[in-house]
Each structure stands twice: as C-alpha cells, then as structure tokens.
Amino acid sequence: MALLQISEPGLSAAPHQRRLAVGIDLGTTHSLVATVRSGEAQTLVDSDGRDLLPSVVHYRRDGHSVGWQARDNAARDPENTVSSVKRLMGRSLDDIQQRYPHLPYRFHASDNGLPLIQTPAGNLNPIQVSADILSALAARAEAALGGVPDGVVITVPAYFDDAQRQGTKDAARLAGLHVLRLLNEPTAAAIAYGLDSGKEGVIAIYDLGGGTFDISILRLSRGVFEVLATGGDSALGGDDFDHLLAEWLREQAGIHDRDDRQLDHALRAAAVKAKIALSSAESASVSIAGWQGDITREQFDSLIAPLVKRTLLSCRRTLKDAGLTPEEVLEVVMVGGSTRVPLVREQVGTFFGRTPLTSIDPDKVVAMGAAIQADILVGNKPDSDMLLLDVIPLSLGLETMGGLVEKIIPRNTTIPVARAQEFTTFKDGQSGMMIHVLQGEREMVADCRSLARFSLRGLPPLPAGGAHIRVTFQVDADGLLSVTAMEKSTGVEASIQVKPSYGLSDTEIATMITDSMLNAKEDVGARRLAEQKVEAARVLESLQSALVADAELLSNDEKGVIVAASEHLHTMMQGSDPVAIEAAIKTVDQQTQEFAARRMDASIRRALAGHSVDEV
C-alpha cells in the first residue's frame, strides 16, 4: 500500500534540504537584500561588490534601469528618474502634492484619485515603480543563491497604514516574490541585535533613514520580542537633512533659478557629498555652479538641529506611552544611514544617557533582521522559539448611537489580535445596521479618523434590543484590519477589509494621541452627555410604543402624569446638562413603574387565556 508523504506546513518534505529565504529592506533612499548563510545573516552584493541599491528607477521608451545607473541619470533626466517612491506609497495625488510640492515628476490622477507618474514607459503608479526595485533585488538574490527564493520578508516603517502595507505586498507580487510577511523596520533591527548580542531588557530602536523616522520601545526577554510602544514621523529623514543643506548651498552660491531641475539635482548631490564628508571631518569643501566654499560641521549641525530635536520629542512621547523613562532603557540601537551624522548620535546618547549601539552597520541591520525572520518562516529553523509581537499605533473601534466611539482594540495592543463585542438594535423592527469603523483615541466620532463603513442587512424584525450582532475586529501580522459583523440567530454576516486611501503620518498620529490627553476632561463630559441623550431617546421610544399598545390600562390622569414626565425629559434632552437628563429619566422611570406592572400582568393574562391550570 502506498503511503502518503506528509510534511509540516512551511517545511520541506526533505528534512535536510534548506529552503532559500531572503529579507528585503525596501528603503526610501537605498534598498538591500540579505540571507542567512551558515547561521549568520549577511547582505547580498551586486557584481561590483556593493550592498546598497539606490531606490531609484530611470525610465526610457525601450526599458528602465534601477539603482546606481538610474541614480547617475537623475541629473540628466530628473523628470523620468523616480526616487524616494516609498514616500508616495498609499497616498492620493492631492496628498502628495500638498506634502511634496517640489517633486520634479509629471503627475496624473487615476480614476480613483491615486497618483500616476508620467514616464516614457507609460503612466506608472508607485506600486509599479516599487515592483521594479524589488525585481532588481530579486534578480540579485537569485544570482547569489543559485535559485529563486522560496519566500521573502519585506520590511516597512512601523507606521505604514493598511493601504501602504497592501501596496508593498502588491509590488512584491508584481515582482514575482512570495511574501512570507511584512515586518516593521525597527522590529527587524531588534531581531538582528537580539540574536547577536543576547540582550534582555528594554531596548529603544532609533531608526532614522532617508525618508522616515521610527522610534520603537521593545522588551526583549528569553527570546520574546515585545513592542511596548512605537512612534515617529513618516515625513522626516536624511532626505530632509539634504534638502536643508542644499538650500543653504543655494543661498551661499546665489542661485535663484528654481526651474532648472538639473541644477536642483546637482545641488542635492553636492549636499549629500558634504553631509557624508562631515560625518568624519570638521569641514567640507563644496563646488557648485561656479561657486566654491566650505561648510563646517558646526554650521551643518545648526541647520539640522531642529529636525534632530523633533526626533527626540517623538522619543519622549513614545517612552511615555510605554510608561518608561529614558533611564529604564538598557540599550539604544541606531538604525538607518542618517544615524551616522555625529550630531544625531551625540543628541540621542545625551537623551538616553548612554552611548548608542552601532556594532551592526546601521544601513544593513534591518535587512539582516528580515533575513533571520525569513529563514525561520520558511522552516530552516524549526526549533526556534523566538516570538515576535508588534503593536497597533492607534485604537480601533466603531460608532455607536449618539456619535460615540466604542473602542474594540486599544492602541499598543500586540498583533496579530482578534477582539469581538456584541451590540444590539436600537429600534423595534430594525432590519439593518451601519457599521462605521474608526481609528483614534477620542470619545466622539467627530474627533476620530474614519476608516470604513459597511452595512449589515437582513436582521430579523425583532423588538429593540432583540437582535444580537457580534462584531469582530481582526488585525493580522501585517497590520491589516478585517471587520466582520454577524447576527447570531440568523447567521447573517457582512465584512470588510480596511484599506485607507490616504497615508497617516506619524506626526498626525502623535497629534491625535496628544489631543486625546489635552481634551480628556472635555471628552469624558461630552461622552456622558451623549450617553444620557441616547438613554433618554431609548426610554422615550420604548414609552411611546407602550402607550400606543396599552394606553387603555391607564386612566386619563395617570396618562397625563406620564406624558408630562416624558415631555419634560424631551425638553431636557435638548439641553447640555447630563445630570438634568439623568434626573428626568429617573422621573419617567418612577412615573411608569405601575404602568409597566400592569402591562406585565396583561401580557401574562393574554398568554394564559384558553389554558387550564393543569396545562400551566
């Protein structure tokens, strides 16, 4: 008899055959690909021995180039050379034009408002451009490993929203890659350092790359990586250092023409060269457009000091979220090429009161961590007991009556996670329910971010409160949110996967959290008022139905007293005093207790009509 060959999910049927896995750091400025060889993570290089691949694509009518060659074409053909495309991922055209007004590209809007970049190769969206970068990294990996990778882990900024994460997955699919999972960049760095150094305790991951800044506070203990809190700014990075320095050079050189894009690129290139030189020297010489001069490290520091201060403010907020002080942080890990700037290392060290860790190349550490995770996920390390816990940045919830927000999953909850809560109908015979999904920390819908709406229809026509709807929020390991609503008695179900069309910056997230703290007292008052108004409306709705059905159980005087109490409650509902509304509700309750008892007796008599005592 033939035997079925069964292997564990994710493992090769041949137990001694290693599967090919890579980690990709899809960066704003540069990208890398890494793998695990002989138990050690290492980056894969190109034919010239270079680890870094510039995240730049140059488009021609007959094709495109990626990386170093594309970057060299940027000065000659800036309109058709796309760089920092990561900043455009998941954003609308309006959003991009507001955030990045100086981009040299020619944009068009697609039918749904998403950006299309006009190139000789056609109109391309950011996902397609990212796919070209990923294809180049995949080709490098295939050449180095001698085969197509079985799986890949791709890193993304901690605050990428659902649309940006989904866009990254779509780009990988276009590039022919099998994505095992997306991994937050700071978390990838924690994996690399956790395995290499074996540290246990609280660690801060300070990640300042070309286009984004992330700060993550993690607790490492016996192989468990738990993200306690995250923060940052998705519109702040080394590119901004370059921009400030380029503007300084423009002023020094007396360059007033802002329409010459080749000159703009030359200014940016000179700024980058000077920045790199100032990381190891006290001054740097610059030659641009016939002007020659020097810039000192002190001058450069004064230019970028406000930006560095912004990163430290994010650090302070994130530590507060984690309930920690800088003194409780055991180590500070520096990630991203921009952390080579001496002022950054100095200021971060001063803030945390300790010298930051830089033993792993800050450009490579994220890709190496991703490679380690990929190696585990394809089954090359089945005995690994490492557990990775990410968190969601803002609370998720839904709208309830009165414009209130019911939080289902609080912010900084570890993911993946699923939470469910039961709700009911407000009116008699209600056959549908609108589910409004929200994100934020405030108490009222108007103060939170709307993520999605969907309808649950086909509810059984029961009295108010009779139908029971179970709403489940599920956030997967990649941070994508699915919401399902199901009526329990009928099994009627509706669901949605939340994919916002706009990116949410870390600054906006920090503002939302700060606003919730500043307005906490007012929000509690507003919630109490709204809750009392909802309860008052429910009481009046129920009373009106009772009067229509059983008014004959009351004398005219009794009915007059109840009507007067209900009218008083209706008047109080129009005001803004929750105490007065609550008192009016109690008055209605007191005046209707006898009526409720008579209705109960009448209901029992109707139920027993035509039945003998023995039958009962």
Swiss-Prot record:
Pfam family, one: HSP70
Gene Ontology annotations of biological process type: iron-sulfur cluster assembly
Protein name: Chaperone protein HscA
PANTHER family recorded: HEAT SHOCK PROTEIN 70KDA
Residue ranges the record marks as coiled coil: none
Keywords, in A-Z order: ATP-binding, Chaperone, Nucleotide-binding
Family: Belongs to the heat shock protein 70 family.
Function of the protein: Chaperone involved in the maturation of iron-sulfur cluster-containing proteins. Has a low intrinsic ATPase activity which is markedly stimulated by HscB. Involved in the maturation of IscU.
Keyword Aminoacyl-tRNA synthetase: no
Gene3D superfamilies: 1.20.1270.10, 3.30.420.40, Actin, Chain A, domain 4, Substrate Binding Domain Of DNAk, Chain A, domain 1
GO terms, molecular function: ATP binding; ATP hydrolysis activity; ATP-dependent protein folding chaperone; unfolded protein binding
Keyword Transcription regulation: no
Gene source species: Pectobacterium carotovorum subsp. carotovorum (strain PC1)
